[in-house]
Amino acid sequence: MFSRQTLLALLSFSGSPVLADFLGPRYPPPADLTSKDSHVIAGWENLTEILQGYLKIDPEEDPILGTLKNTTFSVGLFSTRDDGATSKFQFHHNSPTTKRAKYGTKEVDGDTIYGVASITKLFTVYSALMNLDPTDWERPLTYFFPQLADTAKEARDNPAEHIQWDKITPLALANQISGVPRDGWPLFTTGEKLVGGTAAAAALGLPPLNMQKDPQLSTMPCSNFSDPNITSCADDYDNYVESQENRPPTFLPWANPAYANTGFILLGAVLRNLTGKSLDEQFSSDIFDPLGMSRTYTEAPPKDEWDNAVIPVNNDTELEMVYLLTPDPAKSSGTLLSTLNDLTKFGSSILNYTLLPGDVTRKWMKPHTHTARLDYSVGGPWEIPRYVHPETGLVIDLYTKSGDAGLFSSFLVLVPEFEIGFTVLAASTDRALRALIAGKIGDAVVNALMPALLEQAATEAEKNYGGTYVSTIEGLNSSITITRNKTEGAPPGLTISRFISNGADYLLAEAEASGAPNDPDAMPNRLVPTVVDEKSGRVAMRALTAMDAPKLSKGIISGILSADWTTVGGPTYGALDMGLYIFDVDDDGKATGVSPLAFRTTLKRKD
């Protein structure tokens, strides 16, 4: 697409060489999070001090963090490369409400059961990925629910008021870009003005509703949901689908991301139609049983497990309506209850490719669309904030699923670059502030641990890959020296500080050949991993320029040219990339040799 000479000319014109990194890790994931010398230990101690400080804040000083002490919460970090992290890195707080609650535990730990609300959606998509074939993902909903076909026809002439059901697929539902209504009345009534009664509706200037004659409500089964004498239709998937048929869309299909519980209920209905199993059976056979998630439930746990659960209710009525009420279709959207330790098993299984092949998982863990915020993308059903490292400008995507309903708020965050994840679980009767508080805890985790994880990964990479590699062929003067640039603000990645090939100084010769002999930073001498698989004993790294893109501003169009991904693999010799280096690693992850493939040689690491 763009030659290196073109890029160098552009960089010369701009005055400073700036190329953008690939998306992904800058070092192999860290394996030591729990030894006394690990930077992550220091990061966790810092986080602990921050959380303990938050618990001492007065509400008048900070109305959000000042109420943290009244929220029961648990925080845990886990790693696929250090099993000790799960037990080492946990923080728990018991609120006064929990300590005096009529039901449930008085002391939370890693096995305490919390509601996780919309984290449930991750389980639904996970299970769907195991059961839907590629054709199923692209079928219109009218294929699964033929009763929607008539409304789909009406939408051709009036898409503002009718949903285009024949344009929406399970893939659109999973990726939150289907345009279906957010919440399915009467199943979800949090935002329904009628819940406040007719007087409250009248105060807002809303007209009275006639359930039998209203053009919208009269088409819904069991539309008299507010009447306690009427059985709710929320326990039946078919009725639920029918109740959504004539509602207007939020957006056109595939036009704009919009959070919708309805979408995941419909995805659960698709899953049920294809497998013939209930969601309880599906989750158990696909996920709970294989992973040993013995304390995860699709509805409130049996009463003999309540001593292991957080149930911060004020009275029996609230217990019945908020904790025990579990309409069947909602099980694919937001009813799961789980523990810190069970969610560790769940998150680790995704990062480890335990239940899905690696290629399917990598495809899943990508943004599908963006929001209007530059730091926030959307996937299926990922919420993907983009963390920016304050010193280097490094961008790290945090694959997150939040949950907030009833008595509980939660966050599950996966970070593939480091092969780690963390969970925040919170319980409180203060629904107005609980989600904000859980989010503040998550902020603290990210800000304390991301720099520590990056530093630990860099330290291990220097130890495992740094040094000099030499030819073992007699008379061949070839060697590579790999170091780590520790200059403050230096872009992350190992550095080829010296490369002699057949007696020639390759780095100097490359700089002269590229027309930038006095600008070594413009040369590809920084190594970042592109294929990390110690199981095979081979790790691929590619050479990038020594500069990072986030440091300097670029033009909106001209900046497109300043990107390493546009030139990767461009310079070749004998059909092999000049910038590709394959390392041999032992069982401990330490490099024993390196093969710069284009140079047709293998260099052994000196002790």
Give residue spans per PLM region.
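Catalytic loop of the DD-peptidase/beta-lactamase superfamily, centered on the K-T-G motif
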Residues: 21-97, 111, 324-607
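Hydrophobic residues within well-ordered, non-membrane alpha-helices that form the packing/core
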Residues: 55, 128, 145, 271, ...
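Short, surface-exposed loop or secondary-structure junction motifs
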Residues: 68-70, 80-82, 92-101, 153-411
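Short active-site loop at a secondary-structure junction
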Residues: 42, 64-74, 99-173, 248-262, ...
